[in-house]
Amino acid sequence: LREAFEAAVHRQLMTDVPYGVLLSGGLDSSLVAAVAARYARHRIEDGDKTEAWWPRLHSFAIGLKGSPDLAAAQVAADYLGTVHHGFEYTFEEGLDALPEVIRHIETYDVTSIRASTPMFLLARRIKAMGVKMVLSGEGSDEIFGGYLYFHKAPNAREFHEELVRKLDGLNNYDCLRANKSMMAWGVEPRVPFLDREFMDVAMAFDAKYKMVDKASGGAQRMEKGILRAAFDGYLPDEILWRQKEQFSDGVGY
């Protein structure tokens, strides 16, 4: 699983423009950043033979003042050694952006708007820095059952069926929202967790190993335990075992 994800991130780094990673300090974005940081010194395009234009990975986070994501992202960035850019925004900025956000994401769905607003504001700042592509942690929750309601799955078969249902709908919800809110400013988001070859590996695992078993005392005591265990040592425990938060909650509203 680890090797497949490392290869997926490596493939997604194929680019001839300045790039970075979205880093909320949660498990998914931190894993993407951790792997990308290992490859950032060299150009993927020529088989890692020459140094990259930006030999240090740049990471980006946004939130209201004092938000959990800003604090957690800084911890992860310090550990990984990225050039980190943590941006704060105000309620007023969020409210002012709503008409543009709704126009770009083309929906009045409240959940989509909540998640898109900080991403839209972050994309504007990223584009102003000349960055044109970012890696994101989207897709992990759908592959590994990261949403808290997966705790209630009665058995492995129904757990897996719900994973498939969530993945089938990604193009209409999370991925569509992320693409529209970022591309509004010409920033391309890429999602290594949804790399086809990685998904072939991840979805081949028996769903029982993805389910939460709080009584086990092992990795499965928390959602996405199989993923956390695979990357043991990549991140500090406070990040590797951080509880899942919605993006809109993590940025502080």
Language model segments and positions:
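ATP-dependent adenylate-handling active sites, centered on carboxylate activation for C-N bond formation
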Residues: L1-L235, D249-G252
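Hydrophobic, amphipathic alpha-helical faces that serve as interaction scaffolds
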Residues: L240, K244-Y253
